[in-house]
Amino acid sequence: MISNQTATHSHVADRLDSELLKFISTHAATPGDRVPPLDVLSRELGLSVTKLREQLEVARQLGLVEVRPRSGIKSVEYNFLPAIRQSLLFGLALNANLFQAYGELRNHTEAGFFKEAVARLTTADRQQLRSLVAAAQEKLQGHPVRIPHQEHRQLHIGMFRRLENPFVIGLLEAYWEAYEAVELNVFSDYKYLERVWDYHARIVECICAERLDEGLELLVEHAQLLRDRV
């Protein structure tokens, strides 16, 4: 079994276009592992320092390594967000209407993983969701009214925080990057915000009461509010 896993790992690494990423995936795969300096890698891999520097910058932008002046190059925990964020924002720069398509992907992802995700939440997690609802309602009832955008983002991400799936988490986090990029966080109709947060409050109460089928139904219903808005 171990030999099969090793062979599969090697086969996947061979498909990477970057010699640097191939090296990291096979020799420095654990988060915190140090990657040798570029001059050392240049000799070992037979590539110029210039070429390796280019590959390092790509790896850094993809969030696959950490680069600091004194500590050098280190592997980091795998995170899907940086890669998908760059592609998504580029797509929106070309055509802002793509936000609706990505929003549909996000809605189906949330609905598909909702029951599994919220079943894993701790008592403290659930209390945090309630606190976010209370903070948002306080902003909406204040003078002047404030848009509870951070609470909105934190609530949705918070419902899925215990999922051990970096692709789902990255996809959902990228949605909020896109939401802010198209400036849906800047202005909202007050009635829309009231309706959204009424749904949020009921969803959270369903989570806390373990009425997950009802909570899922409300989640799906509430997604229609943004469809109507955009």
Put a short name on every predicted segment.
Residues 95-96, 183-186:
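Short alpha-helical transmembrane interface motifs in multi-pass membrane proteins
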Residues 25-29, 118, 208:
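Short, locally clustered residues in the helix-turn-helix/winged-helix DNA-binding domain
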Residues 105-184, 196-200, 205, 214-225, ...:
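Conserved amphipathic alpha-helical segments that form helical-bundle/coiled-coil interaction surfaces
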Residues 188, 192:
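Solvent-exposed loop and edge beta-strand segments that line ligand/cofactor-binding
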Residues 1-105:
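Short linear motifs at protein or domain termini
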